């Protein structure tokens, strides 16, 4: 979903950078965030720290994870938006296919994004748990 249907880079970048700042690390750029997305929250944290060539204990990374998640779950769809043309594409595909979404984002957050983006209407009802 993220990176294919929804441009969520800005919301992920904000959550990531707030987390890095909170724990005393340097933030990353919009360009750099592209290389960390797709591995989940812990993957984002690990890659962000690796970019800076710094190490953190597992306990520190867990604290960062919880901080990131507590912010992100409240701000999962602030700057995110469907990519141009996605709604029209889904509308056309919906006529001949049953559509579903696969995401490594938590189910609860996926549902919020689908609802707020107005993409839920294009999915097969059985695919939205």
For the regions a protein language model found, what residue spans apply to each?
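Active-site neighborhood of HAD-like aspartate-dependent phosphohydrolases
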Residues: 1-35
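Hydrophobic alpha-helical core bundles mediating ligand binding, dimerization, or RNAP-core interactions
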Residues: 16, 20, 37, 41-45, ...
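Alpha-helical substrate-recognition element adjacent to the catalytic core
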Residues: 22-52, 58
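Conserved H-loop
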Residues: 26, 55, 119-124
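Short beta->alpha linker loops
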Residues: 36, 40, 81-85, 105
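Metal-dependent phosphoesterase signature
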Residues: 50-87
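Substrate-recognition element of Asp-dependent hydrolases with the DxDx(T/V) motif
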Residues: 86-114
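Conserved small/polar residues in nucleotide/adenosyl-binding loops
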Residues: 128-129
């Amino acid at each position: 979903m993220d990176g294919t249907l929804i441009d969520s880079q800005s919301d992920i970048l904000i959550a990531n950078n707030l987390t890095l700042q909170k724990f005393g690390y340097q933030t990353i750029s919009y360009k750099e965030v592209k290389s960390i997305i797709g591995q989940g929250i812990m993957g984002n944290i690990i890659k962000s720290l690796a970019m800076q060539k710094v190490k953190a204990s597992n306990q520190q990374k867990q604290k960062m994870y919880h901080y990131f998640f507590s912010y992100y779950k409240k701000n999962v769809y602030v700057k995110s938006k469907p990519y141009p043309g996605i709604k029209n594409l889904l509308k056309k595909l919906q006529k001949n296919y049953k559509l579903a979404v696969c995401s490594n984002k938590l189910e609860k957050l996926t549902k919020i994004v689908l609802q707020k983006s107005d993409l839920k209407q294009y999915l097969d009802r059985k695919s939205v748990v």
